Design a protein with these regions (language model features):
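Amphipathic, interaction-prone secondary-structure segments
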Residues: 4-42
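A Trp-anchored, charged/polar loop motif used as the substrate-binding/catalytic surface
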Residues: 1
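Acidic, proline/glycine-rich low-complexity IDRs
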Residues: 4-9, 39-42, 49, 53-111
Length: 111
């Protein structure tokens, strides 16, 4: 899912945020959002979308709480940044964040 999304990333993406959602029935979704701006002091940068996988989110079925799910996805992304096929594409961005859409964003990478 992630590699397919990164293959299609437009050149005008300045930063990426991974929006997390709690769905029904122990399901959790994540979407990749490419943005036209980045400001580590103002999380509204994640609202300036120029690319999104909203119509094709990654869905995980797991009985867990939101914090554990956020940690799970964060760990996955940090590992991907180290050795993923398109890690270089992610690292070209000025910043990468992750967080639930109704919560705070955490920066996991900054150029």
């Amino acid at each position: 899912w992630l590699e397919n999304a990164l293959k299609k990333l437009p050149s005008d993406v300045e930063a990426i945020n991974f929006n997390l959602y709690e769905d029904n029935g122990d399901k959790w979704s994540v979407e990749l959002v490419g943005t036209s701006t980045f400001d580590e002091n103002n999380s509204d940068w994640a609202c300036n979308e120029v690319y999104t996988t909203r119509d094709n989110p990654y869905v995980l079925t797991k009985k867990s709480d939101w914090k554990a799910i956020e940690n799970l996805f964060t760990t996955f992304l940090l590992n991907y940044l180290e050795r993923g096929k398109y890690a270089h594409t992610l690292k070209e961005c000025r910043g990468i964040g992750i967080g639930f859409v109704d919560g705070d964003l955490s920066l996991i990478y900054k150029k």
